[in-house]
Amino acid sequence: MEGITSFENLPEELKREILLRMSPNSLVTCSRVSKKLASMIRTKSFKELYLSRSMRCPRVLFAANGTITPHVLFTSFQEKEKPLLSSGEQRIITSLQGEFLFSPPVRGLICLVERESARIVICNPGTTKFLALPIVEADETTRIITHLGYDEQKDVFKVLCTRTKPETPHLVLTVGSGKEPWREIVCKFPHTVIGAGVFYRGTLYYLAAFHSKSIIMTFDVRSETFMPITSPDGVDLNQGSWRLVNYSQQGGFALVNESRGFIYQSNGGDAYLETWVWNVDTRKWSMNSILIRKWKDYAQDNEDYDYRFRGTQGTYELVFAPIRVKEDGSLTVILYNTDTQAFRRSKVQMMGEGHEFRFVDTFLDHVDSTLLI
């Protein structure tokens, strides 16, 4: 038919621009049907440009294990701009079978550990592609915890692997083809990891146990060295259920006590969010108490679906998300703008009914990536 031009015949720059607007899953399809497109998508320049554009509009990522059928589900949405081809809500069911623990995503990738077999994989949630890592030996009484980081200077991802037995050495793997070995590294501060942490400016931060005391440990991904951080004055990390979250408003991360709810109800439906914020530049803690007007009125289902503070999205918005989905398989995220004192809701369908996906992890600043395509 006259007037119709095939995609293959379009100018290279136009094809490149169209591909840059596609979702990661759509790029996978393109790479399957066309060797020329696959070659373009896998170039370093395209990967860097695609990631750079995605970083301008980060996503909120939800990860869940199926409670009826054993598979991993990812859902993400983008709030900043109206959807292009790569924006909007993305729902992905992976082929990964089993019950997994999730570590926070870094530059479009996420690390998962299967509870029973201790299988470790690196996954791109947008493409469902994953890379299996070598098995780490551990007995039935030992839990494996992983953290994903990125060395910007060498342009490589690294996985820090720790086991809950203090006498076992810490391991590091530089991500490549999947055949790279785990390497034992020396730690001058023997500790066990308590839970997931955050990755910020080349450093992993996580809660750990050191001589029967809870501390905050750091791991420099480039130098592969550990260093503890002193907890805030008057804060006992052994008391309560503390969690680290990204907090970009003050150039670092925040420490919150989830066992106290950290939402303090006051008369009239207002509430206070209290956090300890670590500034990575000044290396100092500061107490942050934010008044949230009419929280009780806005979060009408707060009692049934307990909202937790998950960090900041952009400069001014605080993000609150429930730890489990509703019976219809959906969840509602609340965003509060500290500058305008305005609320927004975003309802996300997790593709499950009843209790199929009961608990969910929420991660901020996830980005689309072409890695593992």
UniProtKB/Swiss-Prot annotation:
Xref: NCBIfam families: F_box_assoc_1
Family annotation (Pfam families): F-box, FBA_3
Protein name according to UniProt: Putative F-box protein At1g76830
Sections of the chain in a coiled coil: none
Superkingdom of source: Eukaryota
SUPFAM superfamilies: F-box domain (SSF81383)
Location of the F-box domain: 4-49
Entries under InterPro entries matching the protein: F-box-assoc_dom_typ3 (IPR013187), F-box-assoc_interact_dom (IPR017451), F-box-like_dom_sf (IPR036047), F-box_dom (IPR001810)
